[in-house]
Amino acid sequence: MSVLSSILGMVVLIAIAVLLSNNRKAISIRTVVGALAIQVGFAALILYVPAGKQALGAAADMVSNVIAYGNDGINFVFGGLADPSKPSGFIFAVKVLPIIVFFSGLISVLYYLGIMQVVIKVLGGALQKALGTSKAESMSAAANIFVGQTEAPLVVRPYIKNMTQSELFAIMVGGTASIAGSVMAGYAGMGVPLTYLIAASFMAAPAGLLFAKLMFPQTEQFTDKQPEDNDSEKPTNVLEAMAGGASAGMQLALNVGAMLIAFVGLIALINGILSGVGGWFGYGDLTLQSIFGLIFKPLAYLIGVTDGAEAGIAGQMIGMKLAVNEFVGYLEFAKYLQPDSAIVLTEKTKAIITFALCGFANFSSIAILIGGLGGMAPSRRSDVARLGIKAVIAGTLANLMSATIAGLFIGLGAAAL
């Protein structure tokens, strides 16, 4: 029954995308089937096949070790404040945000050394050959596995000005369907399962292309002519690369911290108002989370959450992520991952929630896309603005598809035990 419900969820998500497509007749069966096959095959390999699960675990251990090295720098700066066992306990601003700074610097060094470019070219080339997509959208999708929605398009910056509407939309969806490697480390610091975060990041690449090409198929002629490389902004050495990345990471961490202070406080204010008004009618426990849980509970059922209480919790997280952002969603989710949590979620539900939240698909991302892509190619700013809401919908569907597929194989694995 669980398998059938997951398959039904996948079919419904694809059907929604087809209904929202601007040209259903132009949908490429090769691209759609290929992208779905890659997503399902990769999920089966790392979430169901024992050897693949071991490889994913090894990758997660490696990333955890890298994070641990970053903690040395955090401990040096913050001392006892960075030790959760001390009286100060777990301090989000000390344990989570600085990891973003470290990872941002590390990724910049990997870019300087050319390692990231090689990996992106290999993965992007594989996607291009398998799906028949253009070089630009394939490379950007591959880059989104590791970096965020404003950094990934830099890989194909020379293409943006002249790319087709479908290509531009695919790049936007790739950004909304994925997260940045730097913030992934931050989510892991909150207790979100790192294995699922890594898996979701890789699955986001084919998922983003799948829903981008369903909702905005390629009808124009695209060009794969190699643009000229621009090394004018390349750091002079590794130290400058690390410093520049750390500086950018600090700005990101400050933005995340400021955003959380504002939004978490605003949510508390709204909950206070809702509980006060709800108390007049006998609903004193009414909150924004409970409203989201009610609205998105059917969606949680659709993507594979079978327990009623857990479906309500998953609905809360999905609503938070869409209305606010994924960081607030994960912050709420982290409460259910604590040892003293009153509600213990099943492993399948944990996976589904982690995958469903693992993307920048929220309404504030539209402004980020306009600023990022519009800055790289000012002539395309109006196109980005026009396609913004549709890109958020496509990115959300991509995240939900990954969550559904993950739930399917984790459920099969649990049933086989």
UniProtKB/Swiss-Prot annotation:
It is a multi-pass membrane protein. GO terms for molecular function: nucleoside transmembrane transporter activity; symporter activity. Its main location: membrane. The chain crosses the membrane at residues 1-21, 32-52, 96-116, 168-188, 192-212, 261-281, 286-306, 351-371, 392-412. GO terms for biological process: nucleoside transmembrane transport. Coiled coil: none annotated. It is found in: Cell inner membrane. This is Uncharacterized transporter HI_0519. It comes from Haemophilus influenzae (strain ATCC 51907 / DSM 11121 / KW20 / Rd).
